[in-house]
A protein has these predicted regions:
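Short, structured beta-strand/loop micro-motifs enriched in basic residues and often containing a Trp
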Residues: 1-7
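Accessory alpha-helical DNA-binding modules that contact the DNA backbone or grooves
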Residues: 15, 27-230
Length: 230
């Protein structure tokens, strides 16, 4: 079951070592419906997401204002970077078959992968000497990377991992911008909030993302390395 909302944890008084009832309806992610307090052990402990000890000592998580979510605020956090890369490669984003979490981690640790554009610099020779890779698997991954170069505006925008920009928002932006990243980057926050379905939080997140020179440079390098939005 998913349980990432501190307010919900507090409201239901869910503690470590508790017994709970879990309900699933259709394809919806299972949810905790009840704590069995009559079975509560003496060793239960209250849980706070903010107390989580991140593997990287330089990392710290903070709750995003106005949201239930907590995020690591260290831009160089290894777990965060790998998570962003995994998202970019995922089925609903760039759909790079074979580039799952384990391969992303392996390439990251081999210093072959640190940002999106690095994916399109990977060569067969980089892979063949790594564990898990044989001739066929290396060739298959290179083929998958090359096939992903032809993509759509919604897939690419969603893949960037901009906060609050999911698949639906990406499609709205695609329609308004006529599949033009250049037009998207030129929009002001005021112009974006006038788009039906786009709120201020999303508009600010998009503007902040493309105002960051590092982000802009990575996107530009991806395009230079052959990504074609069709």
């Amino acid at each position: 079951a998913t349980l990432h909302n501190q307010d919900e944890i507090d409201r239901k008084d869910i503690r470590i070592n508790d017994f709970v009832l879990i309900e699933r309806s259709g394809d919806v992610i299972p949810k905790i419906t009840q704590v069995l307090k009559n079975k509560r052990p003496q060793n239960t402990q209250k849980f706070s997401i903010s107390d989580y000890k991140w593997p990287d000592p330089d990392c710290k998580i903070e709750r995003i204002e106005g949201e239930a979510a907590y995020r690591c605020i260290n831009p160089n956090c290894k777990s965060r970077v790998m998570g962003i890369l995994e998202h970019f490669c995922s089925k609903n984003a760039m759909n790079i078959e074979g580039m799952g979490p384990q391969i992303v981690k392996q390439l990251f640790e081999a210093d072959l992968l640190n940002s999106f554009d690095d994916i399109y610099k990977i060569k067969y020779e980089d892979l063949i000497n790594l564990d898990r890779f044989k001739n066929k698997s290396a060739m298959n991954l290179i083929d998958s990377i090359n096939q992903s170069k032809k993509t759509t505006f919604p897939r690419f925008l969603f893949g960037l991992g901009i906060p609050n920009v999911g698949q639906h928002i990406s499609k709205i932006m695609d329609k308004y911008c006529n599949s033009s990243l250049e037009k998207l980057t030129e929009l002001t926050v005021e112009e974006m909030v006038e788009i039906d379905g786009i709120g201020e939080i999303v508009a600010i997140a998009v503007k902040d993302y493309f105002n960051d020179n590092n982000n802009k440079n990575i996107v530009e390098r991806c395009l230079q390395l052959g990504i074609e939005i069709i």
